[in-house]
Amino acid sequence: MTINFDTATQTLEAEGLRCPEPVMMVRKTIRKMEDGETLLIKADDPSTTRDIPSFCRFMDHELIAEDTDSLPYRYLIRKGLSK
């Protein structure tokens, strides 16, 4: 199954930022989104390969897809239901 990263509701450009900035920006952006909307994150910090999946698990968001084979890394997240 091919994931189309271009269908994201919003995009967050986090290239050039280093830990913990990318995840902080993801959190801030997702807080403003509606449940079910999708966020494409583009980043080049190697720590995002660990931090973004962990953030999704911890905050109950769905990591739909990730592409970490080349830079920039891309992550597609669906915002979980607000509690």
Curated annotation (Swiss-Prot):
An annotated Gene Ontology molecular function: sulfur carrier activity
One annotated GO biological process: tRNA wobble position uridine thiolation
Keywords: Cytoplasm
Matches recorded under CDD domains: SirA
Active site: C19
Compartment(s): Cytoplasm
Cellular component GO terms held in the UniProt record: cytoplasm
Family named by the database record: Belongs to the sulfur carrier protein TusA family.
HAMAP family, per the entry: Thiourid_synth_A (MF_00413)
Biological role stated in the UniProt entry: Sulfur carrier protein which probably makes part of a sulfur-relay system.
PANTHER family: SULFUR CARRIER PROTEIN TUSA, SULFUR CARRIER PROTEIN YEDF-RELATED
Cross-referenced NCBIfam families: PRK00299.1
Name under which the protein is recorded: Sulfur carrier protein TusA
Source organism of this protein record: Aliivibrio fischeri (strain ATCC 700601 / ES114) (Vibrio fischeri)
Highest classification ranks of the organism: Bacteria, Pseudomonadati, Pseudomonadota, Gammaproteobacteria, Vibrionales
Designated gene of the protein: tusA
